[in-house]
C-alpha cells in the first residue's frame, strides 16, 4: 500500500483540516478517510475545491464534532443518509458514513442505506478514479487505498466504473451525464464498456429531476473544452433526452464555404471558441443555442444552397419553450433570447458599409449585453479558410472601434428618448395611449439615424416640430 503524504502540502488549509479530522477520529475511536475527487485531484495537480470525508461512524455526529473544532456554529445534516455538510469558509467540507445503497427499479432514490466498510463504500462510487481513499490516522497519514485500480485509470486517462457499468448507471442514471462531464473536465476517455452501457441506458436519464440534469449540462459548459462532453452526449444518445433541439442539429448540412458542413459541429466549435474567449457560463450557453432554430428554418435554394432565413427570430421564440423545460432562471432565459435574436446583426454590419445609424441600432438593441454579443460574434467565425478569417477579423475590429467611438459620443448603452412620456402628455394635453409611444419612437428613430443629438434640448425641439404630423396621422 503506497503513501501519498508527499502530495499533501503541509501549509495548506486542506492539510490542516485533514490532520484535525484524523486526530478527531482517534479521539472518538473511528477511522477517517478523505475520499473521491479530492484524492483524484491531488494526483492530477488540479485545484482542490472541497474535502469529502468518509467515517466509520455516524456521519452527522462526526460532522458536529469536527465543526466545533473548526469553530463553525451550524452544519447542514442529512440524517437519513448519515451525511452532513460543514459550511467552513476556507474550504467546503462534507462528511459521510461509509455506506452502500440499494435502489428500486425505475428510480434513482435509494430505498435502503446499509452501513458498510471502506471497500463496500468505494465500490458504490461512480468511477474508479473517484473510488480512492486516503487514511488520515496520524500513524498512517497519507496511506492510499485503491481497491479498484483507480490510480491505473488516472494514468491511462480512462473512466471506468468499479461495478459493472450497467449496474452503476441503472442505479443512478445521472452518472451517465457525469461521465461526459468528467471526460471534458479531465480530458479523459470513457471506457468502451461504459460507453456502450450509457448508449443502451440513455433513456433512463428521463427519471432524473430536470434541475439535476440542467446542473450537469451547465457543468459541461463550464469546462475548458465543452465540446468534448457535448459530443459524448450526442454520440451516446443522451442529447436526445437532455437537449433535443441540439440533437436535431446533428447531420444537417449547411453551406460549406463558411462553416463546418454539419450544423452540430459548427455549434460545437462556436462553444469552444466562446470558452476560449470568456469564462462566463451564460455566454457559453448562448453559443450553444445561437443557431437553435436552424433545423426548423433550413431550406434549399437552387442558387445559394441551404438557407436559414429568420433562424435568429425563430430561435428567440423557441428558447421560451427550452427555458421552461430546462427550468432556467428567467434572467438567463432573457439573456439567451436577446443574444440569439441579435447574433447576426454585427456580422451583417461587417458585410456592409459601416454607418453610424447601423452601429447605433445594434448598441441600443444589445444594451448591457453588447460586449457579450460581440464576443459571441467573434466565436461564431468558424470558417476554415484562413484568409477569410483574417478578413473577417479585420472588418470586425473596424466595427468594434467605430462602435466604441459612437457609444462614447452618443451615450447609447441605456438609450431611450430624452423626452419622457409624462412630459409629452403634459405638453400636448394628452392621456396615456399609442400617440405617446409614436412620438417617443419618432424621437428615438431620429437620434438613431443621426438627425438629432441624443440630448434633451434637441429632442424637445424635434418633438415640437413633428407633433402635428404624428398626431394627425
Residue ranges of predicted features:
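Catalytic cores of the polymerase beta-like nucleotidyltransferase superfamily
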Residues: 1-473
Amino acid at each position: 500500500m503506497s503513501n501519498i503524504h508527499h502530495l499533501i502540502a503541509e501549509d495548506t488549509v486542506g492539510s490542516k483540516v485533514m490532520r484535525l479530522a484524523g486526530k478527531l477520529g482517534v479521539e472518538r475511536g473511528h477511522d477517517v478517510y478523505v475520499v473521491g475527487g479530492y484524492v483524484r485531484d491531488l494526483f492530477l495537480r488540479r485545484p482542490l475545491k472541497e474535502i469529502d470525508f468518509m467515517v466509520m461512524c455516524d456521519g452527522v455526529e462526526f460532522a458536529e464534532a469536527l465543526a466545533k473544532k473548526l469553530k463553525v456554529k451550524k452544519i447542514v445534516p442529512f440524517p437519513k443518509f448519515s451525511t452532513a455538510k460543514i459550511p467552513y469558509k476556507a474550504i467546503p467540507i462534507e462528511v459521510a458514513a461509509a455506506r452502500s445503497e440499494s435502489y428500486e427499479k425505475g428510480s434513482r432514490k435509494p430505498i435502503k442505506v446499509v452501513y458498510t466498510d471502506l471497500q463496500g463504500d468505494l465500490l458504490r462510487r461512480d468511477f474508479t478514479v473517484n473510488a480512492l481513499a486516503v487514511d488520515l490516522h496520524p500513524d498512517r497519514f497519507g496511506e492510499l487505498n485503491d481497491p479498484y485500480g483507480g490510480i491505473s485509470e488516472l494514468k491511462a486517462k480512462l473512466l471506468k466504473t468499479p461495478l459493472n457499468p450497467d449496474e452503476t448507471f441503472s442505479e443512478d442514471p445521472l452518472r451517465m451525464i457525469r461521465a461526459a462531464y468528467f471526460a471534458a473536465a479531465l480530458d479523459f476517455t470513457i471506457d468502451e464498456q461504459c460507453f456502450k452501457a450509457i448508449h443502451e441506458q440513455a433513456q433512463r436519464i428521463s427519471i432524473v429531476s430536470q434541475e439535476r440534469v440542467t446542473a450537469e449540462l451547465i457543468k459541461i459548459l463550464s469546462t475548458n473544452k465543452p465540446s468534448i462532453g457535448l459530443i459524448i452526449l450526442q454520440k451516446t444518445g443522451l442529447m436526445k433526452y437532455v437537449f433535443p433541439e441540439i440533437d436535431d442539429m446533428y447531420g444537417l448540412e449547411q453551406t460549406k464555404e463558411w462553416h463546418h458542413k454539419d450544423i452540430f459541429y459548427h455549434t460545437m466549435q462556436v462553444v469552444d471558441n466562446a470558452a476560449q474567449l470568456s469564462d462566463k457560463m451564460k455566454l457559453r450557453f448562448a453559443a450553444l443555442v445561437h443557431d437553435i432554430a436552424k433545423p426548423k428554418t433550413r431550406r434549399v435554394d437552387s442558387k445559394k444552397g441551404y438557407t436559414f432565413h429568420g433562424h435568429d427570430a425563430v430561435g428567440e421564440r423557441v428558447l421560451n419553450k427550452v427555458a421552461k423545460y430546462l427550468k432556467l432562471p428567467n434572467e438567463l432565459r432573457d439573456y439567451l433570447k436577446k443574444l440569439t435574436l441579435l447574433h447576426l446583426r454585427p456580422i451583417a454590419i461587417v458585410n456592409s458599409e459601416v454607418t453610424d445609424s447601423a452601429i447605433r441600432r445594434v448598441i441600443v438593441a444589445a444594451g448591457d449585453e453588447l460586449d457579450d454579443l460581440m464576443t459571441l460574434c467573434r466565436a461564431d467565425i468558424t470558417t476554415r479558410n484562413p484568409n477569410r478569417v483574417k478578413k473577417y477579423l479585420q472588418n470586425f475590429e473596424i466595427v468594434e472601434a467605430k462602435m466604441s467611438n459612437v457609444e462614447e459620443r452618443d451615450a447609447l448603452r441605456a438609450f431611450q428618448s430624452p423626452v419622457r412620456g409624462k412630459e409629452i402628455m403634459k405638453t400636448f394635453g394628452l392621456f396615456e395611449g399609442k400617440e405617446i409611444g409614436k412620438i417617443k419612437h419618432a424621437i428615438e428613430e431620429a437620434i438613431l439615424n443621426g438627425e438629432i443629438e441624443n440630448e434633451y434640448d434637441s429632442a424637445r425641439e424635434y418633438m415640437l416640430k413633428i407633433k402635428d404630423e404624428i398626431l394627425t396621422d
